[in-house]
Amino acid sequence: GLVGSEMCIRDRHTIVLEGGILCPGFVDAHIHLESSLVTPKEFVRATLPHGTTTVITDPHEITNVMGTDGIDYMFQATEGLPIDVRFMLPSCVPATPMDESGANLDYRAIDSFYDYPRVQGLAEMMNSYGVIHNDPEVVSKIVASQAHHKKIDGHAPGLQGKDLDTYVAAGVYSDHECATMEDALAKLQRGQFIMIREGTAARNLEALAPLLTPQY
């Protein structure tokens, strides 16, 4: 008989659509949901009709104001919504040491949140200087995320050379801030995933479109 003719694929789970329509949805891989200035429920009302079915949000803005209470609120407010809301935990609260924010979160403050099933990892590590120069608090946050087998998003526009080598080697696996092909290629060559954005505030599709070839 034909090679593989004895192979059989068995379903594990069957969903009866009962006349429904099955279609793919968009995934927004990086967002600060609270930046929309509406509640998560209202955000879903605006985005779901346009095909967005999953968002991965970093609640660092509300956390800069409310501390861990802000994270708790976002978890509760996104339960049971028709959009799948996943979380990356804020890595830089405050965003800089000069900020007068409502909270100062070290790795201990966010560590327990890794047990939440919708948490995917550590959000954009904006403190590239701290990563490169082995800042103990920054390293502790990275190590804690890795200990939970979670991903670490990056935020390092224009970082090059040995500094970029160090940043990526620390475990930062993605970047959404590439504005030029040179920047994107340097990070791709080191194994990072590159996000292409064409939204209201950030647009790099035209600059990075040449990446969308079989070569890359």
Q: Could you describe each region identified by the protein language model?
A:
Residues S36-V38, T63-V65, A201-A202:
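Acidic-and-aromatic substrate-binding clefts and catalytic sites of carbohydrate-active enzymes
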Residues L2-I9:
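Short, small-residue-biased leader/transition segments that mark boundaries at the very start
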Residues N104-E124, G130-I196, T200-Y216:
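Histidine/acidic residue-rich metal-binding segments in metalloenzymes
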Residues D28-T39, P94-Y107, Y173, E177:
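Active-site mouth loops of central-metabolism enzymes
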Residues C23-H30, T57-H60, M88, A123, ...:
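Active-site neighborhood of phospho(di)ester-bond hydrolases with catalytic His/Asp-centered motifs
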Residues R12-H13, G20, I83, K150, ...:
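A structural micro-motif
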Residues K41-H149:
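Divalent-metal coordination cores built from histidine and acidic residues
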